[in-house]
């Protein structure tokens, strides 16, 4: 189990940062270094844990039932946490084993989690990336970005218990609670174009008519968490995210992946408010406010005709705020 150790931190309560042009750009970095993961853990939260001997199908249904996106995996034989089961696993299973709407996906119906892990990882078992509650939030952000993961279990080193799952979204929301107390860094007033935050080359997208199975292949190949859905002119009309895929389990429609992404997205049409977008000329402050208020994981960057130009994710934002002080990532 690969855990991030705690650093010795300054006082953890509200800091009095010196307001100088030099220090302003690192004000969020200082904040993250002076707060521990423990500070972010709510007094009450839902945590679902799966034993690796559980059937894969039951595990995914349990994710849906409990309204969570991932769960730590407990290996009874090793008496330790060995990994995470996420929607990405569901996508990988469907993509690997789906044949046609007429053939049942035996591996999804019958495999245990441990069987799937053996097949999928094929002896390339990586230790579970986790973090101590006493480690700084700066360490947590660094670990999320360095390991290219979206969920970081907070595990008590003494008891071995999982206390919470840290995500980019939860960390940014926590930072936003205190953001008005700090002097505003200069880069917050700069535009996306000036800061070059986000991804603007080789954007993975799908058409409205793209079959779900093809979309799953793009998720697997490009390792992205969402795909803008575009019309024939390249204008964004919808977005198909990994989280939408778990609905196939909720509706038990995972045996027919030949339907279009448009049809697969009909389940949420009654409350879907449209794709959340932004423009290159908008400031970083505006972008952060939009992301936090809408509680989404990314914004689609478009031009004045709604043609997709790029994607800005929570990971991009945290990297800019905390690790690079508004500078373009190396």
Curated annotation (Swiss-Prot):
AMP 1 binds at residues 84-89, 129, 150-151. One of its GO terms (cellular component) is nucleotide-activated protein kinase complex. Transmembrane segments: none annotated. Residues 1-21 are annotated as: Disordered. AMP 3 binds at residues 150, 199, 204, 225-226, 297, 313-316. ADP 2 binds at residues 69, 169, 241-244, 268, 276, 297-298. The keyword Nucleus does not apply. ATP 2 binds at residues 69, 151, 169, 241-244, 268, 276, 297-298. Belongs to the 5'-AMP-activated protein kinase gamma subunit family. PANTHER family: 5'-AMP-ACTIVATED PROTEIN KINASE SUBUNIT GAMMA-1, AMP-ACTIVATED PROTEIN KINASE, GAMMA REGULATORY SUBUNIT. This is 5'-AMP-activated protein kinase subunit gamma-1. It comes from Mus musculus (Mouse). The gene is Prkag1.
